[in-house]
Each structure stands twice: as C-alpha cells, then as structure tokens.
C-alpha cells in the first residue's frame, strides 16, 4: 500500500491505473478511522480493482466554534487499518496542498441542506461538497462510498453527483454500531466514561420510536415526543435537533408516508453526536 501527500503523485498513480482500464473505489475520510470506515473500505475492495482512501481534515467544513483544531488525528493507526482492509493507496494531503491559495469557488446544494445538520451547521455542506468536488476531480474514481450514519450527507452527495454529471456511482453503506448500539464515530473518542454510557440514549430513543412505528403509530408528533422524552431522561444529553423528514427530499413531513428519515443530533457534554434510521411503509 502506498501513502502519498501530493496531487501530482496521486494523479501519476491513477493515470497508470486508468491506462490499464482498472476500476477505482474511493473512500473519503477525515481520519481517526474505525470499524465504520473499515466497512466502507471492505465494500470498495469487493467491488473495484483498486481502492483509494483519502485522509484529510477539511477546514472549510467546520464552523468557527467547531472542533477543527481538536479533531483527532492518528495517521499511523489509520494507515494500518487501511492496509488491513484492502486499500491500495492512501491520499493524505496537507491543507496547503488542497487549498494553496484563498478559495473563491464553492459548491452548494440547495434545498437538501436546509434542514437537519445543514440548518445547525451553516457552512458545513458547502465545505463538504467543495472538497468532494476537488477529490472527485483529482482521483477520478469509479465509485465512492459513504456511511448511512451521515444520511443527509449521503443524499446531498448523490444529488450533487447527479446534477454536475460526475461519472461516479455513489454507494451508501449501513451504520456500524458498537455492541451496545452506539453508532461508530470518530468523535466518540471525545467521550469520557460517564459520557460514553450516556451516549447510548441516542440509539435507545430511536429504538423506542421504531418500536412505536412498528406497532402502528402514525402520528409523527407522538413519535417525536417519544424521542424527546427518552433523551430528556439522560442528564448529560442536550438535544440539538430531532427531525422527521421525507427520506428523498429531506423536507419535513407531518404525516407518515412511504419512506421517512428520523434523524437526531444530541450533545453529550460538549460532544455532538448524530444517529438516524429510515422507516418504510
């Protein structure tokens, strides 16, 4: 497995692969990799001749009061995981490589970014879409792999690729959880022992909502209140948002319909965690 840090070097390798007509699977990450990322790499390995993982903590998708400077980083550990699960190449550029000058061009996806994390983190998806556009242009992958834990991101990226005619297939992969149900996240590393225990309230609240839906409850206000009331029992938890939206348009819905996404963001102490599930009639 190779690790490269410059656009010139990564393009040189990719040109050789393309000349041999090899398919390329791409897994974009910000590093501090876990089993969720591993599942994406494994899926890419199964479906492509070559696999690239990018590791880049993208500054332009963080707001001024967010955790860019403290976001966990461990390239050695990440590289070992990438190699273990079948990556051929790790692209780990410096910020100055991706943004050598002040950036004036940005990619925005409207409507789909109005709610959920897009509402709470105003610059986030502009930063995500801009950096992914750069990576897609640099790496020219056949397929790119994203986790369903970031459900809004997955929907936004699919729409961006469709609208801008990128010749890339976007693949969504299931949420990977700890044995006790907590969704795998790099930010779980911020949690102390008590917070880690308290974080289970996210999955617990969603399970209660799903149980009620499966029992025939159709009133989405009742479903939302089940989630709120469950989370409020946990003293360390502070709700950022609870949203019930159409799983395709990400617009709020008031009545149960064919496919809904229930997504939540909750602060456990100072750490913001997200989780979700899709329910289909």
Swiss-Prot record:
Catalysed reaction, written as an equation: (R)-pantoate + beta-alanine + ATP = (R)-pantothenate + AMP + diphosphate + H(+)
Question: Which residues hold beta-alanine?
Answer: 61
User: Disulfide bond among the record's keywords?
Assistant: no
Binding residues annotated for ATP, in chain numbering:
30-37, 147-150, 176, 184-187
GO terms under cellular component:
cytosol
Please list the residues that make up the active site. 37 (proton donor)
Q: Which CDD domains match?
A: PanC
Q: Which Gene3D superfamilies does this one have?
A: HUPs, Pantoate-beta-alanine ligase, C-terminal domain
Q: What class of enzyme is it?
A: ligase
Q: Which Pfam families match?
A: Pantoate_ligase (PF02569)
This entry's Enzyme Commission designation comes to 6.3.2.1
Listed A to Z, the keywords are: ATP-binding, Cytoplasm, Ligase, Nucleotide-binding, Pantothenate biosynthesis
Q: Which SUPFAM superfamilies match?
A: Nucleotidylyl transferase
Principal subcellular localization: cytoplasm
Q: In which pathway does it act?
A: Cofactor biosynthesis; (R)-pantothenate biosynthesis; (R)-pantothenate from (R)-pantoate and beta-alanine: step 1/1
**Which residues participate in (R)-pantoate binding?**
61, 153
- Where does it localize? Cytoplasm
Q: Which HAMAP family match?
A: PanC
Extra facts: The reaction proceeds by a bi uni uni bi ping pong mechanism.
The function of this protein is:
Catalyzes the condensation of pantoate with beta-alanine in an ATP-dependent reaction via a pantoyl-adenylate intermediate.
NCBIfam families to which the protein is assigned, alphabetical: cyt_tran_rel (TIGR00125), panC (TIGR00018)
The name under which this protein is listed is Pantothenate synthetase
| Source organism (scientific name) | Clostridium botulinum (strain Loch Maree / Type A3)
Gene name of the encoded protein: panC
């Amino acid at each position: 497995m190779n690790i490269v840090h410059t656009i010139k070097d990564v393009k040189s390798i990719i040109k050789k692969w393309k000349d041999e007509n090899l398919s390329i699977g791409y897994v974009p990450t910000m590093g501090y990799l876990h089993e969720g990322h591993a599942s994406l790499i494994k899926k890419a390995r199964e479906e492509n001749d070559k696999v690239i993982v990018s590791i880049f903590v993208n500054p332009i998708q963080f707001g001024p009061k967010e955790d860019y400077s403290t976001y966990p980083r461990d390239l050695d550990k990440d590289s070992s995981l990438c190699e273990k699960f079948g990556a051929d190449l790790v692209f780990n550029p410096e910020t100055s490589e991706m943004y050598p000058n002040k950036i004036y061009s940005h990619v925005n996806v409207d409507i789909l970014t109005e709610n959920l994390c897009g509402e709470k983190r105003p610059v986030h998806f502009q930063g995500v879409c801009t950096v992914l556009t750069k990576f897609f242009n640099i790496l020219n992958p056949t397929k790119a792999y994203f986790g369903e834990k970031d459900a809004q991101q997955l929907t936004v990226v699919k729409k961006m690729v469709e609208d801008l005619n990128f010749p890339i297939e976007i693949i969504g992969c299931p949420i990977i959880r700890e044995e006790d149900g907590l969704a795998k996240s790099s930010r779980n590393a911020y949690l102390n022992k008590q917070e880690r225990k308290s974080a289970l309230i996210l999955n617990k609240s969603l399970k209660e909502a799903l149980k009620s839906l499966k029992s025939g409850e159709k009133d989405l206000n009742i479903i939302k209140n089940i989630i709120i009331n469950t989370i409020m029992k946990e003293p360390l938890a502070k709700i950022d948002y609870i949203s019930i939206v159409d799983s395709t348009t990400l617009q709020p819905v008031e009545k149960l319909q064919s496919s809904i996404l229930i997504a939540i963001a909750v602060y456990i102490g100072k750490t913001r965690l997200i989780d979700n599930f899709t329910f289909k009639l």
